[in-house]
Every structure is written in structure tokens, then in C-alpha cells.
């Protein structure tokens, strides 16, 4: 039986899916993995809503929001990789308070999850209102990276794999989003991204979805524990000619791997969701300020 999985064409989830297929892990679990590469987030969601794919990679906030509106989507954790703030070593910025009056580039727009967490963290831990005290420059990930390298801006808040590229060029991480969550007393083990699918479809295709999820966690174990598994991915990672970049990307990816779907991960997500709802509001989470109870699929 075949399962169609929708992911962003150039997204990092392809590293896992390629490893699954290269090692015949899908065949071992008696199914055929069909990866459908999509242009962007909107195309990914449209393919899922239109029934062109069975499973997509998305965040649990979107799944909860859809459930609040009546959908029967459920979520299984994939990754807890989040971004962070990167600065130039020559910037004289050694703490968050040093950002006051400076220019920071932000990827992903005004309701990006890392940006929402940064606002909550700055307010609760540093009494800093980043919206007022810091000059904000929103832009696409490669663009804000370029602006940091050229000295046009003082810091960036970017996605983890774009940050890995900056670190490979000698830039330093001031603060990771994972550390921010920890310092706010939230569990940084909360998964951000995961596999989403319809619960009704899962009930009808119980063996297929379990085989896919088993193969996904088996592949994660391989990427976590066997560095040889990464050799085949260098070209896909666009790091075949840059050992420093390869090292940064593989290390940071492995740090974000979720090895299981557990009640503690769901609990951590619930607490993080409440903070995001408080700062991001309806634009981010929709009409409910609490995580929908059935978001995490408890049948697996």
C-alpha cells in the first residue's frame, strides 16, 4: 500500500524521507512511501485539504486551530527544532538587553512562532518590549541573513537551518528559542512540527499509518545514532562542498529529533500554546486560547 506525504520541496523533512527510501525502511514496514514535494506552505495545506496527499508536515498550532473549526485532523511529533537569535561576533551584543535600539531581522512574518516566543521571553524575563525597543525588519530568510553579513542589521531571528548557515560563516548564536522556553519555565521538548492526517482516514487505514509512523521513528533513530546515514544527504543538504555547514546542519537537525510521541510532549505543547495564544492572539491560534484536547493522536 502507498502513502502520499506532502512536504515542502526544499524542506529539511526530505532528509528523513530520503533516508527512509534509500534504506528500504518503508518496504521493510510493508508500504510504499510516495513523497510529494510542494512549493510552499499554502500549496502543502491545499494538497492536504484537497485530498491529494494523506499526510503533511505542519505545526500543532495549525492542527489545533483546524480542530476548533470542526476538522478531525491529528498530529504526531516530528521535530522540536526551532530558531534563535544570531549576531555578528563583532557586534558588542552579549545579552538580549543589548538589542535595545538595534535592528533585528525577523524571518516568517509578524505571527511567526519564534518571534511570538521571543516577545513573550523578552517581556517576562528581561522586561523588554521588543516591538517598541528594537527596530524590526521582517524579511525572507536568505535576505535577512545577507543583511546581517553585510552589517546592515545587528541581529537576526531566523529558522534553525538558516542559522546553521550563519554559524558556518562565523556568526554566533546569542540565544536559542529552546533556551528561551526553558528560562520561561516551559519545556523545550515541545514538538513544533509533526505529521498531520485525518483521524477518520487513520481509522480506515490503521495498519498503513502505523507502518508509516514506525518507519519515521526508525529513520529518526538512524539519523540520530549513525553518522554514516548522513553521507548520502550531503547533496540534498546543499552542503557537499562545505564541511563546516554540513556539520552545523547535521548537528542542529539531530538536536531537534523527536524520538517518540509521548503524553509529556503533548503537555509541553499545551503550555507553549497558551503563551503563544497570549502574545500571538487569534491571528496565530484562531478562536481558542487553549490547545484542542485531541490534537495529539493518542491512539499511536
Language model feature labels by segment:
Residues 28, 178-188, 255-269:
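Short, solvent-exposed loop/beta-turn-alpha elements that line the ligand-binding surface or hinge
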Residues 1-138, 154-160, 174-177:
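Short, glycine-/small- and polar/acidic-enriched structural segments
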Residues 23-24, 51, 151, 256, ...:
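Short glycine-centered helix-capping/turn motifs at secondary-structure transition points
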Residues 60-61, 137, 142-235:
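Pocket-lining segment of extracytoplasmic ligand-binding domains
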Residues 202-281:
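Secondary-structure end/capping motifs
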Residues 14, 18, 45, 60-63, ...:
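Extracytoplasmic/secreted envelope proteins and their assembly/folding machinery
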Residues 270-300:
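Conserved C-terminal helix/tail region of periplasmic/extracytoplasmic solute-binding proteins
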Amino acid at each position: 500500500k502507498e502513502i502520499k506525504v506532502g512536504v515542502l520541496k526544499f524542506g529539511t523533512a526530505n532528509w528523513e524521507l530520503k533516508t527512509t527510501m534509500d534504506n528500504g525502511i518503508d518496504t521493510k514496514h510493508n508500504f510504499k512511501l510516495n513523497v510529494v514535494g510542494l512549493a510552499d506552505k499554502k500549496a502543502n495545506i491545499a494538497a492536504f485539504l484537497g485530498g491529494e496527499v494523506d499526510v503533511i508536515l505542519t505545526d500543532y498550532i495549525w492542527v489545533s486551530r483546524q480542530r476548533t473549526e470542526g476538522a478531525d485532523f491529528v498530529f504526531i511529533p516530528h521535530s522540536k527544532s526551532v530558531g534563535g537569535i544570531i549576531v555578528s561576533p563583532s557586534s558588542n551584543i552579549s545579552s538580549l538587553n543589548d538589542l535595545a535600539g538595534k535592528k533585528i531581522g525577523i524571518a516568517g512574518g509578524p505571527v511567526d512562532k519564534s518571534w511570538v516566543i521571543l516577545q513573550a521571553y523578552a517581556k517576562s524575563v528581561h522586561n523588554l518590549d521588543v516591538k517598541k525597543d528594537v527596530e524590526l525588519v521582517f524579511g525572507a530568510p536568505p535576505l535577512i541573513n545577507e543583511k546581517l553579513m553585510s552589517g546592515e542589521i545587528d541581529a537576526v531571528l531566523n529558522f534553525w537551518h538558516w542559522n546553521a548557515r550563519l554559524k558556518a560563516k562565523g556568526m554566533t548564536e546569542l540565544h536559542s528559542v529552546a533556551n528561551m522556553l526553558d528560562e520561561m519555565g516551559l519545556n523545550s521538548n515541545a514538538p513544533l512540527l509533526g505529521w498531520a492526517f485525518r483521524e477518520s482516514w487513520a481509522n480506515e487505514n490503521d495498519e498503513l499509518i502505523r507502518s508509516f509512523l514506525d518507519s519515521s521513528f526508525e529513520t529518526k533513530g538512524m539519523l540520530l545514532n549513525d553518522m554514516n546515514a548522513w553521507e548520502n544527504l550531503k547533496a540534498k543538504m546543499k552542503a557537499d562542498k562545505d564541511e563546516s555547514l554540513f556539520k552545523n546542519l547535521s548537528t542542529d537537525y539531530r538536536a531537534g529529533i523527536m524520538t517518540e510521541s509521548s503524553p509529556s510532549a503533548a503537555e509541553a505543547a499545551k503550555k507553549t500554546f497558551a503563551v503563544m495564544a497570549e502574545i500571538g492572539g487569534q491571528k496565530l491560534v484562531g478562536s481558542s486560547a487553549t490547545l484542542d484536547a485531541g490534537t495529539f493522536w493518542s491512539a499511536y
